[in-house]
Amino acid sequence: MKILCLHGFRTSGSFLQKQISKWDPSIFAPFHLEFPDGIFPAGGKSDIEGIFPPPYFEWFQFNKDFTEYTNLEECISYLCEYITTKGPFDGLLGFSQGTTLSGLLMGYQMQGKLLKEHPPFKLFIAISGAKFKDPSIRDVAYKDKIKVRSVHFIGEKDWLKLPSEDLANAFEDPLIIRHPQGHTVPRLDEAAIEKLQKWTKEIIVAHSSENVLDDIQKIGNGDAVQKIPQDSHDNIANGHKDALGDSGEKEQTVDAVPT
């Protein structure tokens, strides 16, 4: 399964990759993660200058109230082409601006506004983010609950805490993992690791079951949908157990770097 990972404002794909790589490796062991850079060079000072080397990028620009956006259409067009040509992608992961943008793409896809030929996204990992405030965007992208399995990391000291909660509410049955940190890719304690491992395992099992069903239909007569025996489901789950791990047994130390 492939996940497209979108970085925060005026950072880079390699910076987000470094942060995510410090999480327990079993969490994303079954996935292939891609970390592209934003399409525009940073138009000002980056919060990670002196902490992580340039270049830095941004996906689009916005005003102080986050009600007006510049180059957003160009950004969306670029990402749709990227997803179409280098995908399919099973899900998105985002931090801050990357989270906000990912949520928009998923909402638009569900409403049939873009990525019509791309398979529906199956998962979303949101690390701080917000909804777009412009009514012309908001009233379309978040019109209905977004039916994608999602996990949302929300920091107690994050200046985007409330917007992150609002974005989580746009999804159907979101998993919310709270942490005491600020606007950052958080350190994960044992409880958070275990929750995330369980969440990813459920997605892998569901994805594997869908693939088995597809294979059965392809080799059948094309009309009848056959049920998968329970022992097949068990074998699927057990087959991924080693890769995913039973539980998180150590705390990860991710540098709390604001972006």
Predicted regions located by residue number:
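Serine-hydrolase catalytic machinery in alpha/beta-hydrolase-like enzymes
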Residues: 1-88
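The conserved beta1-alpha1 loop
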Residues: 4-9, 128, 154-155
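Gly/Ala-rich beta-loop-alpha elbow adjacent to hydrolase catalytic centers
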Residues: 93-103
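A conserved short beta-strand
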Residues: 115-130
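Acidic catalytic loop of the alpha/beta-hydrolase fold
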Residues: 132-133, 154-162, 183-184
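Short beta-strand/loop motif that positions the catalytic acidic residue
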Residues: 146, 151-154
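Conserved loop-alpha-helix segment in the C-terminal half of the alpha/beta-hydrolase fold
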Residues: 156-174
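Catalytic histidine-centered segment of alpha/beta-hydrolase-like enzymes
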Residues: 182-194
